[in-house]
């Protein structure tokens, strides 16, 4: 299924906007790595795209939901198909841009932008399937540098709740389709709320450890136990690009 077809099922509850969207998607798909002006054949076409996305009735969640509902989770094999949900955050830096004053701090107070948190679904052979969820986070100036002061806040009010929300979104797919889902995230997702949220037997996770946690009914902590394990094998991950090639080798017991 092409990206265009998966988005054309979107229903914006407005016939005019839905028709406009059906025109815009093929236009943008022709140049996924290009800007809107670059994908537009004239100024009127460009302004039409900008007007569409500025419309308050156009909600990102409705577009992504329509996309997810059209994804093909079937598999030709007789076994239960396995999918990976890759979840991570990126900083969108708009420092020096016209709208920078309306955004929040990033690594330092004068660096202005927003946090983009994506969860991408891929097949276990590495082929991309689609975008599961996307969140934008604009930090407040008054909260900058006060992470310790925010510790007593309810978890739902913390930025790290994004990991839990995306984990739950991935787990929900297990209730809708016959599949195995593996949630993959970096050490920021090493949060007890995420682990406690696992409910479905086909929902799994691979999360890089950040905390040397205590283990249930075991005298050692996590890292102490791993240090005592015998390496049983290694794996290679080859990431290729037309201009670069990266080969990463890791001991199996390290992960």
Give the residues covered by each predicted segment.
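Active-site-proximal, Lys/Arg-enriched surface segment
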Residues: 53-138
């Amino acid at each position: 299924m092409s990206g265009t077809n998966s988005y054309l099922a979107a229903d914006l509850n407005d016939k005019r906007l839905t028709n406009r969207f059906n025109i815009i998607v093929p236009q943008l798909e022709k140049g996924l790595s290009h800007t809107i002006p670059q994908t537009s054949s004239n100024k009127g076409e460009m302004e039409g795209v900008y007007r569409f996305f500025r419309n308050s009735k156009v909600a990102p969640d409705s577009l992504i939901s329509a996309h997810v509902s059209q994804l093909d989770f079937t598999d030709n094999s007789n076994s239960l198909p396995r999918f990976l949900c890759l979840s991570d955050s990126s900083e969108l830096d708009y420092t020096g841009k016209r709208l920078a004053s309306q955004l929040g701090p990033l690594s330092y107070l004068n660096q202005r932008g927003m946090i983009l948190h994506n969860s991408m679904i891929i097949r276990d052979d590495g082929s991309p399937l689609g975008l599961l969820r996307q969140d934008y986070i604009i930090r407040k100036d008054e909260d900058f540098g006060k992470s310790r002061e925010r510790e007593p806040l309810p978890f739902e009010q913390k930025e790290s709740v994004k990991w839990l929300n995306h984990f739950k979104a991935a787990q929900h797919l297990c209730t809708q389709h016959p599949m195995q889902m593996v949630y993959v995230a970096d050490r920021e997702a090493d949060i007890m709320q995420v682990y406690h949220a696992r409910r479905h037997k086909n929902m799994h996770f691979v999360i890089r450890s950040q905390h040397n946690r205590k283990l249930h009914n075991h005298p050692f902590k996590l890292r102490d136990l791993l240090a005592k394990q015998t390496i049983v094998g290694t794996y290679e991950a080859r990431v290729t690009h037309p201009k670069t090639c990266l080969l990463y080798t890791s001991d199996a017991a390290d992960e």
